[in-house]
Each structure stands twice: as structure tokens, then as C-alpha cells.
């Protein structure tokens, strides 16, 4: 004000704006009133239909960030105005801001002008009240208890309110919080994926990743290594890998599991770097001109350029798309019985696979999510248009990029929800597999003892030596390849059990000529006895499992990943999906999605890592 009285010429105080800054006026208050009026150029559309209003949470973040900037004292604005914005926040009154219409170059001019519009009592100003009611500026001030009434803006105060990056950076900060959570979640569920796929934990070995040097990769591997260390699933998997090792691949499949630390590592680094950049931005002074009181000087610069936002958000979106791509690859292997090490096709949990297609619809949905996510990975910042009479010829598009990244985060939440339910389904199927396989082994063993041990005259029969090899067949055969009809001669179990008896009969030599010592003669009796007892025993074991009376407890309880499983199953009340139940997969996905959106997944996620000290397991 003193500078104006002395005749000092200052941008936005005595001049017009942007390309019309050659105009001059001494009516500073009227100038800023006009600034707010012409910047109110956004479109909201019809209530509830077109969705052109910025989310209230993003608006509130913008208000908070703008207060933080203005409090630093370089913007030329009264403290009372900041107190008024604070009162609106504290009373949960949120001005309505247009979703679109800013290029985040001379700041987020258009959306921020609607906050200024409420402070100055513009008749078109609207706000949201917590009960959903839309209120005008007068009602907002009354409910917020702001006694001073609407503000008559003094010179520079209009610019101080609108000429900043708060909307883009506020939304970016919210997006990055969720992106960081989802990146950690992707690391943990990659480890769970290894558990249910009976993978080899060697891919997390510290030395492998130390030799690559990249910190994100080292962290991802260390988290997975921590989750898998001591895992009950890994102990079982080790025994399985030791069976006929020369008949199996030496290493796990290339991408979805074995390369997950190398894939996730760079994405983690990108998200961390973006977080640091946005942290700097929300704590910066980002308007123009800046008032240096100590030197009694107005500094004309361009801190309102939101390039850190646009670039950080573009990079984050690319990282999110990469995480989603890995998640889709893992999910595709999980539901495919050619790759999932014995789990049923589509993770079908019912008795009849012809009437249970499990997660087939979910895989189609995941493909759609992933495709949209890959499209969103395209950059925004290379679509700059020269604006405002070519005055803003390069601009950041920060809020646009933030909005698109928010969309990408939502899609990754959809994918994470679907995958998490799929992993819990796989965990329960492994539990079912272990219990039913134990039942099959016991039944085969008992039938072998009854039928193969004793001959017709009570003597020991040569077929008694078959039992051990029969049990080996059960151990080596994937349960879900036959369990819907365990005694079917078209399924591998009965075929291979018969093959064992035939091979022993061939070894039996001359004894096969005597019916009392012939193993061939025992095959029919063995199969008939098995057909009499095995289906009943399997069904009985399944019923007991469904009642919660499993003979073998669920291994997940002995794993560090258990808190996440427990959260999905117990707190969110989801359960094994089958074609025999009315409940659809989407109903379960919705529960998990809502929990992720509400931040409820954070505590169980951190509980999985509670014992982790932030470092890889030492090399011994």
C-alpha cells in the first residue's frame, strides 16, 4: 500500500494481468475484485449428473496447502483471510471448485478463484456442507462463525489467493500417499503370490540385489525376503521341489515371480522421488510477485509454474501402470492351471468344476483394468497449449496430470482388491488341498492294507509291497486334477495307481501264473474297494473343513503374511468363493476395495512388516 502511495509500479497491484499487464490503474481493490470475477470461468454442469466439480477432499487439501504457502509471509495478504479459510476447513465447509479449467502455470487460477469467490461473497459461490446440502457464501460464513463478513480485497490479495499451485499439489500429495501404500502392498502380495504358487524364495536373496545396486530393488527384495523367511508354505515347497528335481524347471517362471523385485524396484524409486518433489512444492512459496519486506521489494518471477507437479505425476502414473502390469501377470498365472502348481483352473473352489468358473470373470475385469491403466500411463505434460494470449506459452498441466494419476490410483486399487481376494482364495484352496490329499493318502493306504496285504488263504501277498509306491503317486499328483471325481478312470490318479500295480505285477514274474500270488488279480478288487470308500471319505473331509473342523490347520497362520489374510477374511467377512454359493466375486472385491479406499489396509499391511528392521537378511 505504501508503494502504491509512493507511485511504485508493481505487477498485479497497479497493472493488469498476464498479457495485458501494460494496463495501469490505481484502483487496487477494484482490480482484484475483477480478477476474481473473470477467473470464475469454470463449468459445473447440472447437479449430480455431469460430475464437473472437484472432489471435496482435493479442495480441502488445496485450501490447506494455500494457507501453508501464504503463512510464510511473502504473498502480501492479511492474516485474517487465512483465519477465515481455516474456519471454513474446521467447520467442514468446502467451496465448490470446477474439476477442469487450469493449466497450473500461472498457478491454478480458475479453481482457486472460487475459494476467493466465497471469501469475497460472490453470488455464484457455492459450498458443500457435511450433510450434503449446498450452501451459498453467506450461509458458509454464518456456519463457520466468521464475524468479519465478506472481505474487500486489498491490492495484491486477489493474486495471493489465486496465483499458486495449491490445487495441483494438494491433489498430488493425496495421490502420492495412496501410491506409496499401494507400492508397499504390491511388494507384500508379491511375496504371498510366491507362497501360494509354491515358488522358490531364492529370487529374494540379498546378494543378487546387492550386486544390482538399485535401492528400490534392494528394498522390494528385502520386504519379500522378510515375508517369506520362515514361511510354512516355503517349507512345504522345498520338500516338493526335492521330489524328482531333474523332472522340474531349475528356476521359477521368468516375469511374474522371479523378476518382481527388479520390476518393482524402479517404480518404488520413482514414487519416492515424486513424493519428495511434491513435499517441496506444498511447502514452497509459489505465487507472483513475491513481496520481500526486508528489502521493500516486489520480486517478479514464475514460482507459480507447476512443472514439478506435472512431471512428478506423469512419472508416478507410469510407475503405477508398471505395478498394475506386474499384478495382472501374477493374477493371470494364479488362475491358470498350466502355471499355478496344482491349484484349480480359475481358482474354482466348488465340488463340480463344470458348474464353477471361479475367477474367470475377475480375470476379464483385470485385463480391462490393466488396459485402461496402461493407457493412462501416457504423459500429460507433452500436450501443452499456449494460453492467455501467448503469455503462458509453456505450462505445467499439473492438476490435469494429478487428476489422471488419481484415476490410475483408483484402478490400481481395483486390481489390488481383486488380486488380494484371489490370493486369499488360493490360500484356502491350498488348505483344502492339504486336508483332502491327507484323506486320499489315508484312504489309499487303508485300502491297500485291506486288499493287497493278505492273500485268499490268509498268507502274505506279494502285492503288499505296492503300498509305498501307491502313496508316492498320491504325493506326486495334483489333487485338483482329480478330486471332483477321484475314482474316475479318465483322471490321472486312478490311471497311475493302476500303473503301479501293473509294474509290480510285471516284476512279480512267475508268481503271476498262480492266482493266489498274482498281483494282476488284485487290481480289480483294489479299484472296487477304492471306489467304495474314497469318494465318501473325501466328501466327509470336505464337509468337516467347511464346518471349520479341519484335521490340518491352515498354514497361513504360521506366516508373516497372516495379518493381511486375517484382515480380508475375518474383519471384512469374506470367504471361499464357489459356484455352489449365491455370493459373487464382485461382492467380495467391493469389500476389500472399500477398505483400501478408507485406509483400513494400512494397519494389517504394517503388521506383516512389524518385525522387519528395514534391512535385508544378512548373508550367512
UniProtKB/Swiss-Prot annotation:
Catalytic activity: L-phenylalanine = (E)-cinnamate + NH4(+)
Pathway(s): Phenylpropanoid metabolism; trans-cinnamate biosynthesis; trans-cinnamate from L-phenylalanine: step 1/1
PROSITE patterns referenced in this protein's UniProt entry, alphabetically: PAL_HISTIDASE
GO molecular function, one term: phenylalanine ammonia-lyase activity
PTM comment, free text: Contains an active site 4-methylidene-imidazol-5-one (MIO), which is formed autocatalytically by cyclization and dehydration of residues Ala-Ser-Gly.
Cross-link for 5-imidazolinone (Ala-Gly), residue positions: 105-107
Chain positions with 2,3-didehydroalanine (Ser) modification: 106
Gene Ontology cellular-component annotations: cytoplasm
Residues at the active site: 11 (proton donor/acceptor)
Coiled coil feature spans: none
Subcellular location(s) per record: Cytoplasm
E.C. number: 4.3.1.24
UniProt: (E)-cinnamate binding residues: 163, 251, 258, 288, 360, 388, 391
Principal subcellular localization: cytoplasm
GO process terms (BP): cinnamic acid biosynthetic process; L-phenylalanine catabolic process
Keyword hit for Cytoplasm: yes
Subunit structure: Homotetramer.
Protein family (similarity comment): Belongs to the PAL/histidase family.
PANTHER family: HISTIDINE AMMONIA-LYASE
Function in brief: This is a key enzyme of plant metabolism catalyzing the first reaction in the biosynthesis from L-phenylalanine of a wide variety of natural products based on the phenylpropane skeleton.
Annotated protein name in UniProt: Phenylalanine ammonia-lyase
Species this chain originates from: Persea americana (Avocado)
Lineage: Eukaryota, Viridiplantae, Streptophyta, Embryophyta, Tracheophyta
Gene that specifies this protein: PAL
Amino acid at each position: 500500500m505504501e508503494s502504491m502511495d509512493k507511485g511504485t509500479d508493481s505487477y498485479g497491484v497497479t497493472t493488469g494481468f498476464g498479457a495485458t499487464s501494460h494496463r495501469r490503474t490505481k484502483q487496487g481493490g477494484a482490480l482484484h475484485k475483477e480478477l476474481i470475477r473473470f477467473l470464475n470461468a469454470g463449468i459445473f454442469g447440472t447437479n449430480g449428473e455431469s460430475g464437473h466439480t472437484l472432489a471435496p477432499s482435493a479442495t480441502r487439501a488445496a485450501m490447506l496447502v494455500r494457507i501453508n504457502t501464504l503463512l510464510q509471509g511473502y504473498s502480501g495478504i492479511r492474516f485474517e483471510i487465512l483465519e477465515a479459510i481455516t474456519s471454513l476447513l474446521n467447520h467442514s465447509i468446502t467451496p465448490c471448485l470446477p474439476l477442469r479449467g487450469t493449466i497450473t502455470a500461472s498457478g491454478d487460477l480458475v479453481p482457486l478463484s472460487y475459494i476467493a469467490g466465497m471469501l469475497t461473497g460472490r453470488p455464484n459461490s457455492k459450498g458443500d456442507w457435511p450433510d450434503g446440502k449446498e450452501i451459498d457464501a453467506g450461509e458458509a460464513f454464518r456456519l463457520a462463525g466468521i464475524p468479519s463478513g465478506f472481505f474487500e480485497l486489498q491490492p495484491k490479495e486477489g493474486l495471493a489467493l489465486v496465483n499458486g499451485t495449491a490445487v495441483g499439489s494438494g491433489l498430488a500429495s493425496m495421490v502420492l500417499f495412496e501410491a506409496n501404500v499401494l507400492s508397499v502392498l504390491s511388494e507384500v502380495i508379491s511375496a504371498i503370490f510366491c507362497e501360494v504358487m509354491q515358488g522358490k524364495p531364492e529370487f529374494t536373496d540379498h546378494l543378487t540385489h546387492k550386486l544390482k545396486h538399485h535401492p528400490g530393488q534392494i528394498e522390494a527384495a528385502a520386504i519379500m525376503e522378510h515375508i517369506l523367511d520362515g514361511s510354512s508354505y516355503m517349507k512345504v515347497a522345498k520338500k516338493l521341489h526335492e521330489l524328482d528335481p531333474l523332472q522340474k524347471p531349475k528356476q521359477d517362471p521368468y516375469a511374474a515371480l522371479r523378476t518382481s523385485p527388479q520390476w518393482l524396484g524402479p517404480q518404488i524409486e520413482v514414487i519416492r522421488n515424486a513424493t519428495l518433489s511434491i513435499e517441496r512444492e506444498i511447502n514452497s512459496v509459489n505465487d507472483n510477485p513475491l513481496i520481500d519486506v526486508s528489502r521493500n521489494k516486489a520480486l517478479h518471477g514464475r514460482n507459480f509454474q507447476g512443472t514439478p507437479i506435472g512431471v512428478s505425476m506423469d512419472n508416478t502414473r507410469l510407475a503405477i501402470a508398471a505395478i498394475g502390469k506386474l499384478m495382472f501377470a501374477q493374477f493371470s498365472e494364479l488362475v491358470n492351471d498350466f502355471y499355478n502348481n496344482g491349484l484349480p483352473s480359475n481358482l474354482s473352489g466348488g465340488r463340480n468344476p463344470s458348474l464353477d468358473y471361479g475367477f474367470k470373470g475377475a480375470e476379464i475385469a483385470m485385463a480391462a483394468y490393466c488396459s485402461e491403466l496402461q493407457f493412462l500411463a501416457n504423459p500429460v505434460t507433452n500436450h501443452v497449449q499456449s494460453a492467455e494470449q501467448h503469455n503462458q506459452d509453456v505450462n505445467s498441466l499439473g492438476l490435469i496430470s494429478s487428476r489422471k494419476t488419481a484415476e490410475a490410483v483408483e484402478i490400481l486399487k481395483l486390481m489390488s482388491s481383486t488380486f488380494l481376494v484371489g490370493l486369499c482364495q488360493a490360500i484356502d484352496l491350498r488348505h483344502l488341498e492339504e486336508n483332502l490329499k491327507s484323506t486320499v493318502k489315508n484312504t489309499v493306504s487303508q485300502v491297500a492294507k485291506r486288499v493287497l496285504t493278505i492273500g485268499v488263504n490268509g498268507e502274505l501277498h506279494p502285492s503288499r509291497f505296492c503300498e509305498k509306491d501307491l502313496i508316492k503317486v498320491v504325493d506326486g499328483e495334483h489333487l485338483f486334477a482329480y478330486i471332483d471325481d477321484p475314482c474316475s478312470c479318465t483322471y490321472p490318479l486312478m490311471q497311475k495307481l493302476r500303473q503301479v500295480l501293473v509294474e509290480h505285477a510285471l516284476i512279480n514274474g512267475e508268481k503271476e501264473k498262480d492266482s493266489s500270488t498274482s498281483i494282476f488279480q488284485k487290481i480289480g478288487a483294489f479299484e472296487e474297494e477304492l471306489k467304495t470308500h474314497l469318494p465318501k471319505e473325501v466328501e466327509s473331509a470336505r464337509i468337516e473343513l467347511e464346518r471349520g473342523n479341519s484335521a490340518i490347520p491352515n498354514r497361513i497362520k504360521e506366516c508373516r503374511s497372516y495379518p493381511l489374510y486375517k484382515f480380508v477374511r475375518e474383519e471384512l467377512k469374506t470367504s471361499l468363493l464357489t459356484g455352489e454359493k449365491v455370493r459373487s466375486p464382485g461382492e467380495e472385491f467391493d469389500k476389500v476395495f472399500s477398505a483400501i479406499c478408507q485406509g483400513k489396509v494400512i494397519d494389517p499391511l504394517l503388521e506383516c512388516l512389524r518385525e522387519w528392521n528395514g534391512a535385508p537378511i544378512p548373508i550367512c
